[in-house]
Amino acid sequence: MKKLVLLRHGESQWNRENRFTGWVDVDLSEKGREEARTAGQLLKDEGFVFDLAYTSVLKRAIRTLWTVLDEMNLMWIPVTKNWRLNERHYGALQGLNKAETAQRHGDEQVLIWRRSYDTPPPALTESDEFWPGKDPRYASLSSQELPATECLKDTVARFLPYWHETIAPQIRDGKNVIITAHGNSLRALVKYLDNISDEDIVGLNIPTGIPLVYELDDDLKPLKSYYLGDQEELKKKVEVVVKQGKA
């Protein structure tokens, strides 16, 4: 049996302000830093040890991973950062308050933008301050790779090749891996691992800062999955995510 740990970054400043974040490089809130410390201590107490770590190129995920590894005395292990693990790109919604957007467009429309599989939000323009082509960390990406907006289907399409080509072979070789990423990039992976339908994925919400453990067979098919920690706290955090897009 092989184990994989998935961790959504701790609460960010824009999570706290209930704003669409996407590829905007927002840092953790103080609560988010504490969530990361708690996650690291929990993993350490449960006896987890990692050989490799993967994360996005966004600081809220990177800082969460740093903090977790620091708590576990594992800051020395190899860490790979890749844009394919980024949050889904929220297009022209980035920076907008979710509740205010729901008041303007309706709860149902915002739910579709946030959680549907194949409906992207309105696209960003190249003149927008958040256009990723202006960011040096994406200088190596082609114009076809740079998103102006994404739905979850797009996020799956960019993440899964990296999973198959880079991460999965390490797990098959017996490496203990943690992936610290984002709500939607992790939803993309969970959809694949658990074979969740395009319709049912709408109901999947991943809370901030709580380790999700997968026990996998030799073919990397899930035997079971579970969140570590207090289950009542888990329910509260999931409910927070659910309510974010409502007016």
Swiss-Prot record:
Pathway(s) where this gene product acts: Carbohydrate degradation; glycolysis; pyruvate from D-glyceraldehyde 3-phosphate: step 3/5
Catalytic site: 9, 87
Gene Ontology biological process terms from the UniProt entry: gluconeogenesis; glycolytic process
SUPFAM superfamilies reported in the protein's UniProt record: Phosphoglycerate mutase-like (SSF53254)
Reactions catalysed, as given in the entry: (2R)-2-phosphoglycerate = (2R)-3-phosphoglycerate
Residues annotated for substrate binding in this entry: 8-15, 21-22, 60, 87-90, 98, 114-115, 183-184
Record-annotated site: Transition state stabilizer: 182
InterPro entries: His_Pase_superF_clade-1, His_PPase_superfam, PG/BPGM_mutase_AS, Phosphogly_mut1
Enzyme Commission designation: 5.4.2.11
EC top class, as a word: isomerase
Annotated GO MF terms: phosphoglycerate mutase activity
CDD domains found in the cross-reference section: HP_PGM_like
Keyword list, A-Z: Gluconeogenesis, Glycolysis, Isomerase
Keyword Isomerase appears in the UniProt entry: yes
Function: Catalyzes the interconversion of 2-phosphoglycerate and 3-phosphoglycerate.
PANTHER family for this protein: PHOSPHOGLYCERATE MUTASE
Family: Belongs to the phosphoglycerate mutase family. BPG-dependent PGAM subfamily.
Protein name: 2,3-bisphosphoglycerate-dependent phosphoglycerate mutase
Taxonomy of the source species: Bacteria, Pseudomonadati, Chlorobiota, Chlorobiia, Chlorobiales
